[in-house]
C-alpha cells in the first residue's frame, strides 16, 4: 500500500512540475509572439530565424515534458489497475 501511495505522489508531483513549467513556457511564448507581431505590424525588422528556433525549442520541451508525464501515468495505471 505504501508503494502505491509513493507512486501516486510521484505522478502528482510530476504533473505539478509540468503545469509550473508550462506556465513559464506560455509566458515566454506570449512574449516572443507579441514582439514578432509588433515588429511585423510596425514594419520593423525582426529575426524570424530566432523566433522559429525559440518556438521549436519550446515545442520540444513541452513534448518531452508531457511524454514523460504520460509514460508515468500509463505506468501507474498498468501497475495498479486492479486497485483503481
Per-region residue spans from a language model:
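Extended, charged coiled-coil stalks and adjacent low-complexity, Ser/Thr- and Lys/Glu/Arg/Asp-rich tails
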Residues: 1-84
Amino acid at each position: 500500500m505504501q508503494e502505491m501511495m509513493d507512486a501516486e505522489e510521484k505522478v502528482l508531483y510530476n504533473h505539478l512540475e509540468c503545469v509550473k513549467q508550462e506556465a513559464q513556457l506560455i509566458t515566454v511564448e506570449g512574449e516572443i509572439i507579441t514582439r514578432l507581431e509588433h515588429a511585423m505590424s510596425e514594419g520593423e525588422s525582426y529575426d524570424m530565424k530566432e523566433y522559429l528556433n525559440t518556438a521549436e525549442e519550446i515545442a520540444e520541451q513541452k513534448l518531452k515534458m508531457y511524454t514523460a508525464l504520460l509514460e508515468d501515468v500509463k505506468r501507474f495505471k498498468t501497475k495498479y489497475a486492479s486497485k483503481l
